[in-house]
C-alpha cells in the first residue's frame, strides 16, 4: 500500500483539534470543582454549558473546513471521527453537570468524585495525544497515551459498577436512584468517548508514524 512520506500540512486543522481538546480539559476541571466543592453550582454548570457551545462552534468549523479543503492532513473520515469523538466527550461532561443542577441532587458523594478524577486524567491524556498529532516525530508517543486512556476507561467502568451497586443497595428512594444513575452514566460515558478519541488517534498514528 502506497504511503505518503509525510503528512500534508493544513495547520488550521491541528489548531482546531487542539482547541477542542483543551476545551474538554477546561470543562473537566470545572466539573471536578463542581463535584468536589458543590459551591457556585449554577455558575459552574453555566460555565460548562458555555464551553459546550464553544465546542460546537469548533466542530462546525472543522466540518466546514473539511468540505472546502482539497488536501487534508490525514484521512477525511478520521478527521470527522476525531472531531465527533471530541465533541461527544464535551457533550457528556455537559450532560452530567446539567443533570446535577436540574435534579437538585445535593452534594455528590465518593463515586462521583472518583469519576470526576478519572475524567480529569483521561481528558489530559487526550489533550497531550492531540498535541502530539501535529508533530510526526511524536506520533509514536500517541500509542502510550492511548494505552493510558484505555486504562482510565477501564477504571471508570469499575467505579461506575461500584456506584450502581451501592446506589441500589443503599437507597430506597427510587427518584434518587434514577437521578444518580443518569449522572453516573453520563460521567462514565465521557470516559468511553475519550477511548473513542484514543482509537481514532491510534489509527492515524499507525498510518503515518
Task: State the predicted function of each range.
Residues 1-209:
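Cytosolic, long alpha-helical scaffolding segments
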Amino acid at each position: 500500500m502506497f504511503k505518503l512520506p509525510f503528512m500534508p500540512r493544513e495547520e488550521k486543522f491541528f489548531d482546531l483539534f487542539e482547541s477542542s481538546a483543551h476545551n474538554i480539559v477546561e470543562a473537566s476541571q470545572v466539573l471536578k470543582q463542581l463535584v468536589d466543592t458543590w459551591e457556585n453550582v449554577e455558575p459552574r454548570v453555566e460555565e460548562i454549558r458555555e464551553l459546550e457551545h464553544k465546542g460546537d462552534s469548533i466542530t462546525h468549523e472543522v466540518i466546514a473546513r473539511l468540505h472546502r479543503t482539497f488536501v487534508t492532513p490525514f484521512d477525511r473520515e478520521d478527521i470527522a471521527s476525531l472531531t465527533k469523538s471530541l465533541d461527544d466527550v464535551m457533550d457528556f461532561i455537559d450532560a452530567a453537570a446539567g443533570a446535577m443542577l436540574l435534579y437538585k441532587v445535593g452534594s455528590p458523594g465518593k463515586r462521583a468524585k472518583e469519576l470526576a478524577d478519572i475524567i480529569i486524567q483521561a481528558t489530559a491524556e487526550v489533550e497531550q495525544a492531540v498535541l502530539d498529532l501535529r508533530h510526526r516525530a511524536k506520533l509514536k508517543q500517541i500509542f502510550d497515551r492511548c494505552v493510558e486512556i484505555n486504562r482510565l476507561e477501564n477504571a471508570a467502568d469499575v467505579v461506575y459498577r461500584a456506584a450502581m451497586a451501592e446506589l441500589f443497595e443503599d437507597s430506597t428512594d427510587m427518584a434518587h436512584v434514577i437521578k444518580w444513575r443518569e449522572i453516573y452514566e453520563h460521567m462514565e460515558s465521557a470516559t468511553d468517548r475519550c477511548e473513542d478519541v484514543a482509537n481514532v488517534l491510534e489509527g492515524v498514528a499507525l498510518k503515518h508514524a
